Amino acid sequence: MALVSPIPAMGERAGSMRFHGIGSPGSRSSRSGIMDEPVSRLIDEKIFVAVDKHVAKSKSTLIWALQNTGGKKICLIHVHQPSQMIPLMGAKFPVGAVKEEEVRVFREKEREKVHMILDDYLRICQQRGVRAEKMFIEMESIENGIVQLISELGIRKLVMGAAADRHYSRRMTDLKSRKAIFVRREAPTLCQIWFTCKGYLIHTREATMDDTESEYASPRPSISASDLLQTFSTPESEHQHISRVQSTDSVQQLVSNGSSTEQSGRVSDGSLNTDEEERESDGSEVTGSATVMSSGHSSPSSFPDGVDDSFNVKIRKATSEAHSSKQEAFAETLRRQKAEKNALDAIRRAKQSESAYSEELKRRKDTEIAVAKEKERFITIKNEQEVIMEELQSAMAQKAMLESQIAKSDGTMEKLNQKLDIAVKLLQKLRDEREELQTERDRALREAEELRSHAETSTLQLPQYFTDFSFSEIEEATNHFDSTLKIGEGGYGSIYVGLLRHTQVAIKMLNPNSSQGPVEYQQEVDVLSKMRHPNIITLIGACPEGWSLVYEYLPGGSLEDRLTCKDNSPPLSWQNRVRIATEICAALVFLHSNKAHSLVHGDLKPANILLDSNLVSKLSDFGTCSLLHPNGSKSVRTDVTGTVAYLDPEASSSGELTPKSDVYSFGIILLRLLTGRPALRISNEVKYALDNGTLNDLLDPLAGDWPFVQAEQLARLALRCCETVSENRPDLGTEVWRVLEPMRASSGGSSSFHLGRNEHRIAPPYFICPIFQEVMQDPHVAADGFTYEAEAIRAWLDSEHDTSPMTNVKLSHTSLIANHALRSAIQEWLQHHL
């Protein structure tokens, strides 16, 4: 164990480090004499404070001690635990595996850090006008080190922490720290200890004295303050020891007046060793002597004349010299403290200067590189200028030639002006025809809407399932549920990709043991068998025997996978994200406004939005959806489920799902499309960014360069959708759609510059005839709700088929309805893309 005093010897830091103790001896000329201050008084004048290596953890303990010292001096004590692993070449090695020199250098650095930490504590004391000194030892156990310091130094008053500040509470009445409990139990009982936490006194262990500690508590009257002088050294070994110099009395001389019947006192010489540093320089020991009269049986008159006066003079002289030595020792302590502080400051300034010099060299090198690049750039520009001058001369020659051609072109331009007048008249005529066509188109759209409502009504007549598949077909399609064909798994069950009746499909195997399994199975069949929409997943059939649902296969994965770039999938561009948001909005409007069976999805999130090969989005997972009341206002449920981050807080508390619940989830999805960040607390982050004008920093850089105006418009629209009160959320069909549809149209036009030629010409899937697999020219809606090319569906019906080509379910009738709206959209797409 090594004890380090508050005044290190500056000249010996590099070798065997030596530090002076609390009380330093005086100068060499005044070391003989009696120091009349007892040990107990020196110890009682100080309050010892145990501090941690982290200033923040012990600052409150030190401040409490400063406020309750009563003007007494503070002594900071610290137990340093040497590291058993030495960092070397980017790694850490045990002490035994490293050279002794490297271990010694590392230990020196550790001690310098400890000094700097204790200096921070000293500055706190200095700011409050309290004198303080520092001391630390090196031990593997902190609590044993504190107890040993109390025993070795005879500490009477100690302040230390009862527990970490985070454990403090008003009800705290006992110690929480293992170290504090150990010190309270093992420390000498005559030491009074205050235990504090977060600036409050938690427990006080009062000092008591028993017979075993009487010698420790009451030093001999002959032991003066000089007995407290200590020599603290830093040994070469890892475990350190503290040494203390004690004064001893020996009988030296018998003084008598010549009478054989009278006794006289004896004179004893006490020798006090100075520190080892002075012994090495002098080669001899410095001793101090004092004369003490014993209380014999002889009377004062038995001494020779003048003996009392001579003794009194010597005692006064020794006392004066001891007092002077004490003052000089204190002055020397202050000087050494100041010298140590100045040396540490000089070292820090030197390191700062060295760092600044290195940075300046680096900046200079960077500047030289930049200058060299600028020179190369200047030469390149000069060469380009010469080339441009040559081209300019050539252009001047061409200009003269063109001027002659212009004169010839004037006559031609006159003729063209005449043709232009004719073209303007023709254009005006075409505009008139266009207005008439637009009027006819609007009328056709209204008729198509009416026909669509009739088609929706007809879908109610469909049977419960599209196609019944046998369990053997499901097993064959999934290769007996081969794990390599599994593409998804959750509490609902597993999803496999397979080939069923020569068609690639996705097969969801619901878990029949789940309490919600049969309910979700029946719910999805009832919902998806009665509706068709381009942005809602198509249910092809079911297998009641195996609780299986057969869907169309969408190879693009989920929107969640694409937002997180799962399996290194390419990120979605901002144009695709705007289009996907528009498609989801259209699907939700369809669900909410379907007069025959309006419903709320209830679990809208990116994981339930699937993408096909053309990144067309489709809603899925209708197992937890809820049918609305006939008035379309709400659906009362007591088991509202869903992902917390996307769940409407109002619906979660009331148990009532409304269309506004899907609006809230849609708003969170909009924010994720904008930022690419997790859904939890995303609305707060976007609102903060909008308020502080930092929205551009929050946008997902993987989506490309967002148009800031459109991005801000989307962000504010999404925040409105995420309002806590449902009445404040916008309507999807009137407000949200009017923002998204124009934005999709504008982004689609501008995005063609970035798309490849082949990708740009891919038709949307709802333009493709399910039979011919080509873009439809004359789309018609059949009784099964699907749209086909008129020629294809008529050929199907003429071949004596009375079932649906898609679902194999018997058709309720064979009438066909022309889909004018889809035909108009296909023609418009063909004009722009072919």
Swiss-Prot record:
Residues 481-744 form the Protein kinase domain. The active site is at 603 (proton acceptor). ATP binds at residues 487-495, 508. Residues 243-273, 284-293 have a biased composition (Polar residues). It is an enzyme of class 2 (transferase). Its EC number is 2.3.2.27, 2.7.11.-. Gene3D superfamilies: HUPs (3.40.50.620), Phosphorylase Kinase, domain 1 (3.30.200.20), Transferase(Phosphotransferase) domain 1 (1.10.510.10), Zinc/RING finger domain, C3HC4 (zinc finger) (3.30.40.10). SMART domains: S_TKc (SM00220), Ubox (SM00504). Transmembrane segments: none annotated. The keyword Nucleotide-binding applies. It catalyses: L-seryl-[protein] + ATP = O-phospho-L-seryl-[protein] + ADP + H(+); L-threonyl-[protein] + ATP = O-phospho-L-threonyl-[protein] + ADP + H(+); S-ubiquitinyl-[E2 ubiquitin-conjugating enzyme]-L-cysteine + [acceptor protein]-L-lysine = [E2 ubiquitin-conjugating enzyme]-L-cysteine + N(6)-ubiquitinyl-[acceptor protein]-L-lysine. Residues 232-308 are annotated as: Disordered. Residues 334-462 form a coiled coil. SUPFAM superfamilies: Adenine nucleotide alpha hydrolases-like, Protein kinase-like (PK-like), RING/U-box. One of its GO terms (biological process) is protein ubiquitination. Residues 762-834 form the U-box domain. One of its GO terms (cellular component) is cytosol. Functions as an E3 ubiquitin ligase. This is U-box domain-containing protein 33. It comes from Arabidopsis thaliana. The gene is PUB33.
